[in-house]
């Protein structure tokens, strides 16, 4: 996105990411957090400020990872005079606290899931909430995101352990063990709405995404638009998202997340004040580059200016269907255990209607245990949902990734499942369909051949015996 608008790009990288693609693709790249661990290096806000000062940086984009919702980064950018490409500081603070976010949604008149009025600090409070609202309930981290710090509780017997696990996970992931409670809805769809707002008071939605294919509250496959929901319900959800964000004068890209139930009702979950991993499917069906739009909004443009060219809400239409699959170095047959190692071979899919957003996906890349296991995002577009599925299946089958395990066979099973085809799946889809984890035996001929060539190159032909030179009788030639 920065290259498209002719912006000089300065990247940061940790010692462990020395060979990463983003370091080599940027115009300039500098080591951050020298002497610190792989995570702490990227969280070193003061060192980021130093690099920005020393290398004439004008603006900082937080990405969608470590610091994407960190209000301290936005605050330091303002103090140092750097443009923060994202929401205002107040919005990061407002929506970073999930209880505060619920309050804002309530003020906007958005339907809410029954929940605790504030944080809970004892098992007794959780028991009281369960007695009032009934099981199942869900425990959530106040500062949470990405499915971490969340535990569903189905009975009193599970309550104490779930409470302890949620608090410890929240503390480890977010630096705070504050939690709150919500009633757990059975078999909903996870629907989110992409919002764009500028500094001129304009706020629009770019329609919705269906993110219901998930495991342990972490998304695996995303679809846009949410074609399986009635159009009237989709419109109501999008209008509610815009209403909430207009109420707080939101700026930049953001996502409002909801649960939609089988009775065609919907309920607010949270706001993510950042760009999200799955923004690609929205870009494909609307033709709007969301990250590039963020950059231009930060420069002061209106979303309706020619430089951005987003039309009025009534003229923002969708065209076709898009699917995103997150290809990860995880082993679905082993409880999605992350795998590490070196990619000894890598070949990606491609073709018309296929988009790849790569991480460190290349032959020779070393997959470490330090960061997220996402290897590459594959997004396909088609005039219909079925066409998008067909293109994705072809794309996945064209991939050749050797050296580490991946979830590609699992993704193929998801795409071919009847519930995914007709859109009738819910957030329980993966849990309820154990057949998704039945995989055909792979021949893996490529890896076997590579291993064989490497072995004989180093060790010789150990399986071929060396015979003594044969002796032949003198040849009698006729005279």
What does each of the following model-derived ranges do?
Residues 1-256, 260-276:
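N-terminal beta-alpha lobe that positions the nucleotide/phosphoryl donor
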Residues 241, 280-479:
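Catalytic cores of soluble metabolic enzymes centered on carboxylation/carboxyl-transfer
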